[in-house]
From Swiss-Prot:
Signal peptide positions (record): none
The protein's name in its UniProt record: ATP synthase gamma chain
Family: Belongs to the ATPase gamma chain family.
Record's subunit section: F-type ATPases have 2 components, CF(1) - the catalytic core - and CF(0) - the membrane proton channel. CF(1) has five subunits: alpha(3), beta(3), gamma(1), delta(1), epsilon(1). CF(0) has three main subunits: a, b and c.
Listed SUPFAM superfamilies: ATP synthase (F1-ATPase), gamma subunit
Organism: Paracidovorax citrulli (strain AAC00-1) (Acidovorax citrulli)
Function, in words: Produces ATP from ADP in the presence of a proton gradient across the membrane. The gamma chain is believed to be important in regulating ATPase activity and the flow of protons through the CF(0) complex.
Entry GO MF terms: ATP binding; proton-transporting ATP synthase activity, rotational mechanism
InterPro entries: ATP_synth_F1_ATPase_gsu (IPR035968), ATP_synth_F1_gsu (IPR000131), ATP_synth_F1_gsu_CS (IPR023632)
Gene behind the chain: atpG
Length: 288
């Protein structure tokens, strides 16, 4: 029964693994709900800022903020949002594949790139492919804080405002639902005029700006872009927990299937050993 003992050891090992993956699935499910709440809570804030800034822009059509101006620089910036940890399926792989495709497209046009990495997985990938990483933010935990993001991303925002780069792209995993997440590489800067259109309402707002409208719109647009980055990080975290929950559930189910197969093999092995012993006993009795 040496084989049977070995199989029992494998069953015990897989059962222990199943307990771990089940616990991780439950933890991810709990974190996913909190991450979704944060993601949804951030949307009204950025939308309200966008609408106020758009109203300001319409009231002051002669002023164009640097974030809405195009330039001819031969360098583009990337903000790449990934996770700090693994065990979340192919989520990071998919977004990094999309980033790679965009990098190659720009390089074929003679445009160099600079990158800000948010998350360990993206930072490691960008370093491996030899990308120019100008700043990074890692170890954000389960709750992203804007003050930890502002410093790293400000490097690219300032570079764009100064005309050193011709655009900023934001790459992250967009949360669709628990079972579906989508890799996105979208242009963050320059802000499109379509995006900055104010909502049509039944009544207009007559704002009083202090110290002046230009100062207010300068500050608002920076806050708006920062809120878009925060929203992307929040969406990425919701996607991470959803992907991890699904991956751990699949691992738990697979472990259950393996345990079932091992038990079947064990029972067959045990049955064969018992049959052999009975045959030997019968043969011995017949010989007597």
């Amino acid at each position: 029964m040496a084989a049977g003992k070995e199989i029992r050891g494998k069953i015990k090992s897989v059962e222990n693994t199943k307990k771990i993956t089940k616990a991780m699935e439950m933890v991810a499910a709990s974190k996913m709900r909190k991450a979704q709440d944060r993601m949804r809570a951030a949307r009204p804030y950025s939308e309200k800022i966008r609408n106020i800034a758009a109203n300001l822009g319409q009231a002051n059509p002669e002023y164009v903020h640097p974030f809405m101006k195009s330039n001819d620089a031969k360098t583009a910036g990337f903000i790449v949002v990934t996770t700090d940890k693994g065990l979340c399926g192919g989520m990071n792989t998919n977004v990094l594949r999309a980033v790679t495709a965009k990098l190659r497209e720009l390089q074929s046009q003679g445009v160099s790139t600079q990158a800000v990495a948010i998350g360990n997985k993206g930072l490691g990938f960008l370093n491996r492919i030899g990308a120019q990483v100008v700043s990074h933010a890692t170890g954000l935990g389960d709750t992203p804080h804007l003050d930890k993001l502002i410093g790293p991303v400000k490097v690219l925002l300032d570079a764009y405002a100064e005309g050193k780069i011709n655009g900023v792209y934001l790459a992250y995993t967009k949360f669709i639902n628990t079972m579906k997440q989508e890799s996105v590489v979208e242009q963050l800067l320059p802000l499109s005029s379509e995006k900055m259109q104010a909502e049509k309402t039944e009544h207009g707002w007559d704002y009083i700006y202090e110290p002046d409208a230009q100062s207010v719109i300068d500050d608002l647009l920076v806050r708006y872009v920062e809120s878009l980055i925060y929203q992307a990080v929040a969406e990425n975290m919701a996607s991470e927990q959803s992907a991890r929950m699904v991956a751990m559930k699949a691992a738990t189910d697979n472990a259950g299937n393996v345990i079932g197969e091992l038990k079947l093999v064990y029972n067959k092995t045990r049955q064969a050993a018992i049959t052999k012993e009975l045959s030997e006993i019968v043969a011995g009795a017949a010989a007597v």
